[in-house]
Amino acid sequence: MATAATEEPFPFHGLLPKKETGASSFLCRYPEYDGRGVLIAVLDTGVDPGAPGMQVTTDGKPKIIDIIDTTGSGDVNTATEVEPKDGEIIGLSGRVLKIPANWTNPLGKYHIGIKNGYDFYPKALKERIQKERKEKIWDPIHRVALAEACRKQEEFDIANNGSSQANKLIKEELQSQVELLNSFEKKYSDPGPVYDCLVWHDGETWRACVDSNENGDLSKCAVLRNYKEAQEYSSFGTAEMLNYSVNIYDDGNLLSIVTSGGAHGTHVASIAAGHFPEEPERNGVAPGAQILSIKIGDTRLSTMETGTGLIRAMIEVINHKCDLVNYSYGEATHWPNSGRICEVINEAVWKHNTIYVSSAGNNGPCLSTVGCPGGTTSSVIGVGAYVSPDMMVAEYSLREKLPANQYTWSSRGPSADGALGVSISAPGGAIASVPNWTLRGTQLMNGTSMSSPNACGGIALVLSGLKANNVDYTVHSVRRALENTAIKADNIEVFAQGHGIIQVDKAYDYLIQNTSFANRLGFTVTVGNNRGIYLRDPVQVAAPSDHGVGIEPVFPENTENSEKISFQLHLALTSNSSWVQCPSHLELMNQCRHINIRVDPRGLREGLHYTEVCGYDIASPNAGPLFRVPITAVIAAKVNESSHYDLAFTDVHFKPGQIRRHFVEVPEGATWAEVTVCSCSSEVSAKFVLHAVQLVKQRAYRSHEFYKFCSLPEKGTLIEAFPVLGGKAIEFCIARWWASLSDVNIDYTISFHGIVCTAPQLNIHASEGINRFDVQSSLKYEDLAPCITLKSWVQTLRPVNAKTRPLGSRDVLPNNRQLYEMVLTYSFHQPKSGEVTPSCPLLCELLYESEFDSQLWIIFDQNKRQMGSGDAYPHQYSLKLEKGDYTIRLQIRHEQISDLDRLKDLPFIVSHRLSNTLSLDIHENHSLALLGKKKSSSLTLPPKYNQPFFVTSLPDDKIPKGAGPGCYLAGSLTLSKTELGKKAGQSAAKRQGKFKKDVIPVHYYLIPPPTKIKNGSKDKEKDSEKEKDLKEEFTEALRDLKIQWMTKLDSTDIYNELKETYPAYLPLYVARLHQLDAEKERMKRLNEIVDAANAVISHIDQTALAVYIAMKTDPRPDAATIKNDMDKQKSTLIDALCRKGCALADHLLHTQPHDGAAAGDAEAKEEEGESTMESLSETYWETTKWTDLFDTKVLIFAYKHALVNKMYGRGLKFATKLVEEKPTKENWKNCIQLMKLLGWTHCASFTENWLPIMYPPDYCVF
């Protein structure tokens, strides 16, 4: 056996499939038509120019003609201009940058900027580098430092048993060092590399240099021009292996550092057009084609596509006159074939003859799961994913070859508006090149992301041949050739494979043979606002229906008017299904003609039915249809009370990859379904996909979708539940995984349940006190246990600023159509550390279908540090924020300023996740709710029985801090008592759970808090009844006014005058202390500060204060007033001690002996220093009697006391606490200095690298 296996040749052809599509046979016939002369734009995560196979084409041209990042994720603001001094400039990082003498810069000015590497590193690379840096740079040094600190602590504990004040401080110092090192290890956070960037003009072109070594020696760094000028690129280092190129915009004021955001884009490009001169068997489908790499996956958003990236990309596609676009991206859309992005794609296709190929999506196996734009946009060729037997062996190493099939996850049509959705299919897996930073040469990936470039490469071969023979083609003729020559697989349904598997050689022959004018045209098919006939809900198939269908020719952009006038087409219309009736002929000219199609689905069996009305040119019927009208009808099964609203299937046989679809009319009143799957096989475990979709108008399929990938063990059972909408058809699909070997038999049951709430959403206003909702059990006996859980509080913001401006050179559509941006600024306070989800309600959940170009928000802290960003899908972009003030900047782009101006007051919301969920009390009748008595627990409802419930308001002490009027609490209502019923109350609409939402949402609107009576206010009211003598009031007011002006005028005379008049008035001495301590010349008046502090301390009866604090309770009637007075005295005493201590410490820290001073002076200074030190020590220990050293007021004094005693561990402990309280750059620098004094250079280095990230010069660019 072993010998036979080793003798069998390796199936190289299955690694990157070309046989299945006819690409191999085409290249055998026409080896010169290998993609030469064809330019493919790859819109993806970016292509690595250093990856294997990405260097040259078969005819020696550069493989990648340009590399562009249209997202802005690699943009660096280089608007700051500087001139070198002595051949050096100071970068924005603070590093000294040495300008090499051989650089040419006639103007002598450099644009500088700064960029954190982790801002544009791919996620996988960032994680790898973080791990490596910790293991190599941090861990070895930190372990030594920690071991040394522990050793010193242990030695001191052994040698010193005494508890003197000096020993106590030393012990605290050593303990602080150990605690700090342990804390730094726990809080370790790698800032990553911080790169200084330079841009300048050498007299001929713009050049850029990135200080990739982070040491300022620019002579060892690459100098690059725009990639398109000379195909130059460099790498950030041998550890990263991340290749980058640059583009310079706006006269040097903006540098774009272009890297790949993930491995996806390079893999896609390698499939389409990779070329290996030495190993041709590894070639992509079209090795002779060139590539334009456009990065549309924004690294800031985990390579999510954005409107900005896509519209800029289409501008570049048009400007570069690309022949083909490959777009292996897409999302579910609420309405197909619409939106600004789709408009720009249509313009590139229809007006500029660019063929746009895109993935259909990976959201199958249910119907109508095609993504946008691949399966929903008329101008785009959507490609499904097919797997062949050779691929199974070569790529997946399956034990046995299975029949060819569509991948289980490949999205299926039709589109929601009736269009077929999937145009063609191609192999959906490959082992191909990936970027160098992955540290691997190739990788297996699968998805419609891989089938799209395979088809795109095949089309490139066709175009290469057409161009070589000067055969004219249009996007319409090429698409028709692909669809009319594709091979249909018998065992794969039309909605999965579309028109079939692409056949390159046959498509080429078709275009050579069919060159008529009619074949160059496109035809728009409309059925009202739809593109096909899609009858899915029960009411739509209950009776025959007539449909008006519009057919209109679409002429290529350069068509002469005379050709339009003379256009006359004689069409034969055919339908191969008896349930569809259509006219037999149509005369078409340059206008939209309408025909009537009658659909009578009454005699159709349960299940799915598809047919087409095809239009043939009677002059060349063998060329296939010129257009098709797709018609889909779904006949749903019915469940009723007699079957207990259940559907049961027993001993159902499943082959590998087999799919069984069940369309069911959901009973009116049903709210969830339960699916039970049981294996009948005792020897085979099997992988299954359970998938259910209900379609709602103008809602994406993911809004009402359930998906579960599961492994079913031998004789095992699986139970799942998901929400449903009553009265509409649902598709439930159970599919055996495509690679799951051996046959298996299973039983499965679908059971419907219904507990209906009168309100689809509960809106509760706190002022109403009691809110009612009614619940009905619609189908069966159901166990109820209603529960309202509040999970977040939502804050609504209004913009504090809105600015509109025209964008730069990258944002101009053809015919000089300038794009504009509006930037709205919002501010909010985060009351405590927690998770937030920012979103723009007006625009969120809209991407391709949005009427605005794009939306992008970035959140900044008060130092302008970027904390996170997000766009159309807010639930993907939750982030954790510490307590503090934050700014959100929201960018919205559009071609019309007037449309942007409408949004200048656009609200924005921030959802704050609650650390602990809150519950609202629910009662079964109004009187119980009114009295706050017995809460509802659980009950059983008979069918059709109605039960009211009453919800009471949330206690005021439960309202989260920071939430107030204008805010609301958000959560959900669950009704069922059973675990499955509760599980169905949460809808995981997308398989990644990104769009998880509540089936019955609850909004609890807040009102102002109750007015609180302050302590002692009653006593003050009584005191106020005793009218003061007016003269006495005037005297006191005059005194207070003089004290106020004393601090402003710095008048010692006023102080002395008041001191004589009011010798026992404590606020006077406090004001004097604060005045002296806040002066600019403070360092010259330290002794006066000490005296002023002593004066304050002497006027406080510390004995009486200590006795009061020791009291457990105060029975006196004016206890509240006494407490306020004592609290103020304690606070004043601590304040005075700290200010005195700081002054003494500053005196010692800044007193330095002068060289050559007289011996007597030196002795006097030494005695003075000892006296000051003694006084400082007394003050320190006195302070510890009254408060904790980590109290905010005491921190600076404790910090300075530690510095005086050269106890840098204690000092650093207090300094880190100061940073937590007030994270200023100066406080961080103090920490860094102490780290260096302690010898912890690794901590200092990492913290220093954090500074330019935490304190950037300005907000980052969009």
From Swiss-Prot:
The modification N6-acetyllysine is found at K401. Expressed in the brain, skeletal muscle, gonadal and mesenteric white adipose tissue and brown adipose tissues. It is found in: Cytoplasm; Nucleus. The keyword Phosphoprotein applies. The active site is at D44, H264, S449. Residues 1016-1030 have a biased composition (Basic and acidic residues). It catalyses: Release of an N-terminal tripeptide from a polypeptide. Keywords: Acetylation, Aminopeptidase, Cytoplasm, Hydrolase, Nucleus, Phosphoprotein, Protease, Serine protease. InterPro entries: Peptidase_S8/S53_dom (IPR000209), Peptidase_S8/S53_dom_sf (IPR036852), Peptidase_S8_His-AS (IPR022398), Peptidase_S8_Ser-AS (IPR023828), Peptidase_S8_subtilisin-like (IPR050131), Peptidase_S8_subtilisin-rel (IPR015500), TPP_II_domain (IPR034051), TPPII_C_art (IPR022232). Residues 9-508 form the Peptidase S8 domain. One of its GO terms (molecular function) is tripeptidyl-peptidase activity. GO terms for biological process: proteolysis. Disruption phenotype: Homozygous mutant mice die in utero before embryonic day 9.0. Heterozygous mice display normal food intake but appear lean with a significant reduction in body fat, smaller adipocytes, decreased plasma insulin levels and less white adipose tissue in the gonad, groin and mesenteric regions. Disulfide bonds: none annotated. The limitation of proteolytic products to tripeptides is achieved by tailoring the size of the substrate-binding cleft: the two negatively charged residues Glu-305 and Glu-331 that are blocking position P4 limit the number of residues that can be accommodated in the binding cleft and thus create a molecular ruler. At the same time, they orient substrates so that the tripeptides are removed exclusively from the N-terminus. Cytosolic tripeptidyl-peptidase that releases N-terminal tripeptides from polypeptides and is a component of the proteolytic cascade acting downstream of the 26S proteasome in the ubiquitin-proteasome pathway. It plays an important role in intracellular amino acid homeostasis. Stimulates adipogenesis. Belongs to the peptidase S8 family. This is Tripeptidyl-peptidase 2. It comes from Mus musculus.
